[in-house]
């Protein structure tokens, strides 16, 4: 088995048993009908833990293409950190241990919610308890959310934090994210949060009383005025500080204010030394230890093909061009050796339901040209099912599927003539579920499975799997050995 190969990604076309409001089901699709009758096919998972997202969370094009190209599950920060904490890995985490052991006092700061966008309260609690096990005095600096969660939910999360408080763990300060998590260089906001960290802005109220007093002034969680509580007198030289947010953009300014000598946003108390660590990499210029470093994605599908001096072409229209280049190549912007890229402009319409065929025909012509040139691997994305599905227009989504089907017919016909192998799948679903139970349009991705079809010498059946099984399957069709980092093929 060693064939030139097509990897076709039909973006947003998923599997759904129910035919109601299912644009894929209702489309006239002779090519798909032929593939169902003549090719082995299976179902592929594209959401939740199978692609490194939290359980039940819908997949997306960025994560999907990364997973396809890497050939393995790349856990997103929220999941990666949660799994590590569940496995009790903190006790062996060098950045964490080195930071907390430099001082008897450890300051933990971060967004206090389970929104999962910037942080998670479970991470906050786990770090605090691990610090306590090491006999540290722990000062909690709580940032209230109200944006990724309900605007007046802080008291619920505060209770969870209070449940771990004792003589060694205390709530030291509080601040709305509007202040402590600014990202627009509005340093007058950061300054207020910074002052509370320094032991200024004292309130005689308890944390719960203080939050309620803010509510009484019609101030919601996002905008809670920074304050510090009794028995907290500010950070001191030589103490340790960990910022627990895993998303970096809204963490940089407050960390810069605490640790960067060249910071000039406002006048600050000068520290000789604070032992700072961050949850993930926040900025390339930061010298601080990182508890969960960015994972380097190597030996991707494109890289392996390039290592064998084979040719490849990555083709998509504008809407999905980054996905078949940057994302499928593991976050690498520069093309690999012998990698050709073809960008087809997307049509200039307000919304794609006005032109559901989008630029699929032009994309197909580029694919056919590369096949005639004998390119060893052709990766192509058809954007229609996703981009038209996002409009919520059922009739247009049916036309989008029909347009893709016609293009697939041309490609499949030439593939058989030129002895190309083919693997066809989707990065996630969308257009197979267009209305909810109340008949309102559904415009989001679906959290379900997608089809996978294979045309290849000797391939009679394929297993169910997930997107992490695609790269090794493509390499097998090409007669190439998959690297040990990749998960098993589907056949």
From Swiss-Prot:
Entry superkingdom: Bacteria
Protein residues bound to Mn(2+) 1: 386, 390, 445
Keyword flag Metal-binding: yes
Residues given in the record as Mn(2+) 2 binding sites: 11, 61, 427-428
Cofactor: binding details: Binds 2 manganese ions per subunit.
Pathway stated in the Swiss-Prot or TrEMBL entry: Carbohydrate degradation; glycolysis; pyruvate from D-glyceraldehyde 3-phosphate: step 3/5
Matches recorded under Pfam families: iPGM_N, Metalloenzyme
EC number, UniProt record: 5.4.2.12
Protein's GO biological process: glucose catabolic process; glycolytic process
PANTHER family for this protein: 2,3-BISPHOSPHOGLYCERATE-INDEPENDENT PHOSPHOGLYCERATE MUTASE
NCBIfam families: pgm_bpd_ind
Protein name: 2,3-bisphosphoglycerate-independent phosphoglycerate mutase
Organism: Helicobacter pylori (strain HPAG1)
Gene: gpmI
């Amino acid at each position: 088995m060693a064939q030139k190969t097509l990897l076709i990604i039909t973006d947003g076309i998923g599997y759904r048993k129910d035919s109601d409001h299912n644009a894929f089901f209702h489309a006239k699709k002779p090519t798909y009908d032929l593939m169902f009758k003549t090719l082995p096919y299976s179902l592929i998972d594209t959401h939740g833990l199978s692609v490194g997202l939290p359980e039940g969370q819908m997949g997306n094009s960025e994560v999907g293409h990364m997973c396809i190209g890497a050939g393995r599950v790349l856990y997103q920060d929220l999941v990666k950190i949660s799994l590590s904490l569940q496995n009790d890995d903190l006790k062996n985490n060098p950045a964490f241990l080195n930071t907390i052991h430099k001082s008897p006092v450890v300051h933990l700061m971060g967004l206090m919610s389970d929104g999962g966008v910037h942080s998670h309260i479970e991470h906050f609690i786990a770090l605090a308890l691990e610090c306590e096990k090491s006999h540290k005095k722990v000062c909690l600096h709580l940032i209230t959310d109200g944006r990724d969660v309900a605007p007046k939910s802080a008291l619920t999360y505060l209770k969870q934090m209070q449940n771990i408080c004792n003589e060694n763990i205390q709530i030291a300060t509080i601040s709305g994210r509007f202040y402590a998590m600014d990202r627009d260089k509005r340093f007058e906001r950061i300054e207020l949060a910074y002052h509370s960290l320094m032991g200024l802005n004292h309130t005689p109220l308890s944390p719960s009383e203080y939050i309620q007093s803010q509510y009484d002034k019609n101030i919601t969680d996002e905008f809670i005025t920074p304050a510090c509580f009794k028995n907290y007198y500010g950070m001191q030289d030589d103490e340790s500080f960990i910022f627990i947010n895993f998303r970096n953009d809204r963490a940089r300014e407050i960390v810069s204010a605490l640790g960067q000598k060249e910071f000039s946003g406002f006048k600050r108390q000068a520290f000789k030394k604070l032992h700072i660590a961050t949850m993930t990499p926040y900025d390339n210029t930061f010298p601080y230890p990182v508890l969960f470093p960015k994972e380097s994605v190597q030996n991707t599908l494109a890289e392996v093909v390039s290592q064998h001096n084979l040719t490849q072409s990555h083709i998509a229209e504008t809407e999905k061009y980054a996905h078949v280049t940057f994302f499928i190549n593991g976050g690498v912007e520069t093309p690999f050796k012998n990698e050709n890229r073809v960008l087809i402009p997307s049509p200039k319409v307000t919304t794609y339901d006005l032109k559901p065929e989008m630029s699929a025909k032009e994309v197909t012509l580029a694919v056919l040209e590369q096949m005639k040139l004998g390119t060893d691997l052709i990766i192509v994305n058809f954007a229609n099912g996703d981009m038209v599905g996002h409009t919520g227009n059922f009739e247009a989504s049916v036309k989008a599927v029909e347009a893709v089907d016609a293009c697939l017919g041309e490609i499949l016909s030439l593939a058989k003539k030129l002895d190309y192998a083919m693997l066809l799948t989707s990065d996630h679903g969308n257009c197979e579920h267009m209305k909810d139970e109340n008949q309102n349009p559904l415009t989001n991705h679906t959290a379900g499975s997608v089809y996978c079809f294979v045309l290849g010498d000797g391939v009679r059946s394929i297993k169910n799997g997930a997107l992490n099984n695609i790269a090794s399957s493509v390499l097998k069709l090409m007669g190439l050995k998959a690297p040990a980092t990749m998960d098993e093929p589907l056949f």
